[in-house]
A protein has these predicted regions:
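Conserved alpha/beta enzyme-core scaffold
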Residues: 1-209
Length: 209
């Protein structure tokens, strides 16, 4: 394995299986951006088309989710979130595998993700946080690909420039109308601002809320 030194003298591998080529940190302001923003898919609503469906499973089928894709979630529900676990349970029953899980963060309530890693449903994680027991198990090497951890701002940048492409974003919205307009201000599970999910809603190929 070949290595390059970063700005603080630490040797960083040139390439990691499951991630690809690595660019070492060269120092503050050392690299000027040359990329363009990724283009979001253009969408149109056919007259009288209904966006509401009867179940999460039906929504997943309509999204076209398949093996090898990337799915995302936000973490505004903090340790009370059940959406990640419920969605992965449904995806598992549908037989979909080899997914990259790209949430804004994962909390202690997401321990059930461990079983989906072991069964091959989830093979990669890109997040801004991992906590026990999930983090402990991943540290033991149960995940097929190396985890990518970014700051919250770094995650938004990665989605905007296409480094992290989201195929289907699952947005836990306390309130949402049939046109897809949503907010966190009202509803039984009102959580306040949903800033972490904005970039997902803007750039994901499909949004399920």
């Amino acid at each position: 394995m070949k290595f390059n030194k970063n700005a603080v003298g630490r040797e960083i591998p040139e390439y990691l299986e499951g991630i690809g080529e690595l660019v070492p940190f060269k120092g503050v302001d050392a690299i000027k951006p040359t990329k363009s923003k990724a283009g979001a898919k253009l969408r149109m609503r056919i007259q009288d088309e209904k966006k509401l469906v009867a179940s999460i499973e039906e929504a997943i089928k309509k999204s076209g989710l398949k093996d090898g894709m990337t799915i995302s979630f936000h973490h505004h529900m903090r340790n009370g979130d059940t959406v990640v676990n419920e969605v992965l349970d449904i995806i598992s029953k549908m037989g979909i595998k080899d997914l990259t899980l790209a949430p804004s963060s994962l909390s202690s309530c997401h321990g059930p993700v461990i079983d989906h890693i072991k069964s091959g449903v989830v093979t990669g994680i890109q997040s801004s946080g991992l906590r026990e027991p999930l983090g402990d198990e991943i540290s033991k090497g149960i995940l097929k690909k190396p985890v990518i951890i970014r700051s919250h701002g770094g995650r938004a940048r990665a989605v905007e420039d296409g480094e992290l492409h989201i195929d289907v974003a699952f947005i836990a919205a306390p309130s949402c109308d049939e046109m897809g307009n949503m907010n966190g201000r009202i509803g039984k599970s009102a959580c306040g601002s949903m800033g972490y999910a904005i970039v997902d809603a803007q750039y994901a190929d499909h949004i399920i809320a």
